[in-house]
Swiss-Prot record:
Gene name linked to the record: nuoD2
Organism in which the protein naturally occurs: Rhizobium meliloti (strain 1021)
Short name of any one Pfam family annotated for the protein: Complex1_49kDa
GO molecular function: NAD binding; NADH:ubiquinone reductase (non-electrogenic) activity; quinone binding
Protein name as it appears in the record: NADH-quinone oxidoreductase subunit D 2
Keyword list, A-Z: Cell inner membrane, Cell membrane, Membrane, NAD, Plasmid, Quinone, Translocase, Transport, Ubiquinone
PANTHER family xref list: NADH DEHYDROGENASE [UBIQUINONE] IRON-SULFUR PROTEIN 2, MITOCHONDRIAL, NADH-UBIQUINONE OXIDOREDUCTASE 49 KDA SUBUNIT
Family: Belongs to the complex I 49 kDa subunit family.
InterPro entries recorded: NADH_Q_OxRdtase_suD, NDH1_su_D/H, NiFe-Hase_large
Domain of life: Bacteria
Lineage: Bacteria, Pseudomonadati, Pseudomonadota, Alphaproteobacteria, Hyphomicrobiales
Subcellular location: Cell inner membrane
Length: 404
């Protein structure tokens, strides 16, 4: 049999091979959005990958120039639509820097608690979606069960499950409703055991491990050179987290560990997100313990809407305040600012130029998914076509944030 096989194998120029271009997407379930990858293949090896983006471009940055600062919050919801509270927070902090104000302490605790709920929500999806992409369906069903609990909590606070628009310049839209804290405590008690369930599903799954361990390796040096951030950076051994290293809001009052891994492969990126969910639970519990009573937005009539909505119906001053802020907005001092937070996907930044009017002269969004997607150039060379799904899934891009 060996002799026959050797005789059948072509030699030299008799082996006729050629490079093939293959389109992956833009309609493909494993791209998790409208992303088109043009792959240059040599057999089953990926020699080159060219991401083609823009299928979900809505002109968010240009639209913002025609909106007042308050009206921009719904636009930020639609960047990383899996984690709207984080987007709201990053934008609010940028505008507050221009105004030279800070939200009340209670509002800061509420914002951080919402941001960590959003982090868990975003990580839950990729925790289940990456195994599903590689054939392990059960993890996604479990993850969606817990994510539904978070959606219920967000709906209880904001009235919306996805596009929450909860932050406001100078605070949050409204205070926590009655009965919310017991609900979130119940979630914090249940969820750590559920995380362990996900790990048990995966840690002995030989197919998932073989498809992710040692696949799509990004070294620490390459991760820094590519500008990666968030779990994709920390999974390569770079110990950097804006919440700790450049703290904003009340993160400097909270105790948490920055999760890092050394391997830099797809499995490490998955594990980083799983472990970060545990830390988010710790942060939420500390927020509930430390949160003081007090106002949930600044008491500046030219910036904040009336706290007591009933006054709008019986007070001329409150009605004028509400109408003026709704129709005209508020003037922001001329200047420019850049504000960045640690969003679930990485460093989310807003660069705003103000000309002194109620609308930004220019707004630029530093979207972490856009930057992280560049890592495809560095990790797919000489890899199998089948590995592309694992690599892309482990980077966890959201195309609405990429295309803006």
């Amino acid at each position: 049999m060996t002799e026959v096989t050797e005789l059948m194998r072509p030699e030299g120029e008799a082996l006729n091979t050629k490079e093939v271009l293959l389109n992956l997407g833009p309609q493909h379930p494993s791209t998790h959005g409208v992303l088109r990858l043009v792959l240059q293949l040599d057999g089953e090896y990926v020699e080159r990958v060219d991401p083609h983006i823009g299928y979900l471009h809505r002109g968010t940055e240009k639209l913002a120039e025609s909106f007042t600062y308050t009206q921009i919050f719904p636009l930020t919801d639609r960047l990383d639509y899996l984690c709207p509270p984080s987007n709201n927070l990053a934008f609010a902090l940028a505008v507050e820097k221009l105004l030279g104000i800070e939200a009340p302490i209670r509002a800061q605790y509420i914002r951080v608690m919402m941001a960590e709920l959003a982090r868990i929500s975003g990580h839950l999806l990729i925790t289940g979606a990456l195994p599903m992409d590689l054939g392990a369906m059960t993890a996604l069903l479990y993850a969606m069960r817990e994510r539904e609990m978070i959606m219920d909590l967000l709906e209880m606070i904001t009235g919306a499950r996805m596009h929450t628009s909860y932050c406001r310049v100078g605070g949050v839209r409204e205070d926590l409703p009655d009965g919310f804290l017991p609900k979130i405590r119940e979630f914090c008690e249940i969820f750590p055991n559920r995380i362990r369930d996900y790990e048990r599903l995966i840690e002995n799954n030989r197919v998932f491990l073989s498809r992710t361990q040692g696949v799509g390796v990004i070294s620490a040096t390459d991760a820094i050179d590519l500008g990666l951030s968030g779990p994709n950076l920390r999974a390569s051994g770079v110990d950097w987290d804006i919440r700790r290293d450049e703290p904003y809001e009340i993160y400097d009052r909270l105790d948490f560990d920055v999760i890092t891994r050394e391997e830099g492969d797809c499995y490490s990126r998955w594990l980083c997100r799983v472990d970060e969910m545990r830390e988010s639970i710790r942060l939420i519990e500390q927020c509930m313990e430390q949160m003081p009573e007090g106002p949930f937005q600044v008491d500046i009539p030219t910036i904040a809407f009336p706290v007591d909505k009933e006054r709008v119906h019986c007070s001329m001053e409150a009605l004028i305040q509400h109408f003026d802020l709704s129709a005209y907005g508020f003037d922001v001092p001329a200047g420019e600012v850049y504000s960045v937070i640690e969003a679930p996907k990485g460093e989310l930044g807003f660069y705003i130029i103000s000309d002194g009017s109620p609308k930004p002269f220019r707004m630029k969004v530093r979207a972490p998914s856009f930057v992280n997607l560049q890592a495809l150039f560095g990790v797919t060379n000489a890899r199998y076509l089948a590995d592309m799904i694992a690599v892309l899934g482990s980077l966890d891009p959201v195309m609405a944030e990429v295309d803006k």
